[in-house]
Amino acid sequence: MSLSQKEIIERVRAIAEPIVTSMGLELFDVKYRIQAGKWVLSIIIDKLDDYVSTRDCELVSYEIEKVLDSHDFIPGRYYLEVSSPGLDRPLKKIEDFRRFVGKLVKVKTKKTYRGYIVDVNMETKEIILRVDNENITIKYDDVKSANLEIEL
């Protein structure tokens, strides 16, 4: 029986999470999609206190590939890609906002804001941004998307 795309992602996540965590890294995301006519399994990793290195990606790829090959539940050929979220990474959890206090972000709610994270109130789930010399409070539940902005 063939698994759906969603089921493959869930299984890969269950396999990858403990491997990545044991290496002192965080599993940021798993994607399984067609790219340029070929299936690509993307595992995105992060490091809480530093940047992800090429070596980190190589080690994670090696370890996960061994386990995926032994389980063999992904049909056909696919490419395994391990990478970091990048400089303009999405902010998916409220903890991400707290981690990047002081950084420039773009936050989409009903409106789009571009400013610096001043503070995050974990109890009220509110994010305070400094936009054009003014502090703006945004409820985390109102955030549709957010990402770090690259400062030049």
UniProtKB/Swiss-Prot annotation:
Source species taxonomy: Bacteria, Thermotogati, Thermotogota, Thermotogae, Thermotogales
UniProt entry keywords in alphabetical sequence: Cytoplasm, Ribosome biogenesis
Principal place of residence: cytoplasm
Pfam families: DUF150_C, RimP_N
Compartmental location: Cytoplasm
UniProt record similarity statement: Belongs to the RimP family.
GO biological process: ribosomal small subunit assembly; translation
UniProt-recorded name of the protein: Ribosome maturation factor RimP
